[in-house]
């Protein structure tokens, strides 16, 4: 039985991994392109038209990526995927938020900015963030601890998208190591 339907924009880091996340924690998540014919109720259910957006068979609705990820993990069989301790869970949420806001904003400005000036400013911001991230990963195997958590999976998704847009990670060896290791996680491999 389907645990939830999640409306997504396909081929984006915020949505592509949610079905695989659900599978990993023992839940069947159906993802639907929010612009498809199958999504006829999307606008009625979610008038702000923002994705991802989750709805369960009993009508529970949830928006915002971090809330959706935490809900799926908490309802699944592997709650430790968000961290085992209060500190790990808080740190994991911190990194999810960092990537979902700071990094996505800079990357989006670089990839889709309306003019060259904004694209260059966004690129400089993204490169500064990559330096910060690389330094952090020089002291920690993953973002929160030595276990892959949801923030690591989401970060991998964002880095993969950045590579598709031509971002060169060769100056960030710890980011390259990180992406190589996380690419082997079942959530990524089952996408």
UniProtKB/Swiss-Prot annotation:
EC number, UniProt record: 2.5.1.18
Entry keywords, A to Z: Transferase
GO cellular component annotations of the record: cytoplasm; nucleus
First-tier enzyme category under EC: transferase
Gene3D superfamilies the record matches: 1.20.1050.10, Glutaredoxin (3.40.30.10)
Induction: By O-dinitrobenzene.
GST C-terminal domain boundaries: 85-191
UniProt-recorded Gene Ontology molecular function terms: glutathione transferase activity
Ranges for domain GST N-terminal: 2-80
Domain of life the protein comes from: Eukaryota
GO annotation (BP), single: translational elongation
Protein family (similarity comment): Belongs to the GST superfamily.
Function: Conjugation of reduced glutathione to a wide number of exogenous and endogenous hydrophobic electrophiles.
Protein name per the record: Glutathione S-transferase Y-2
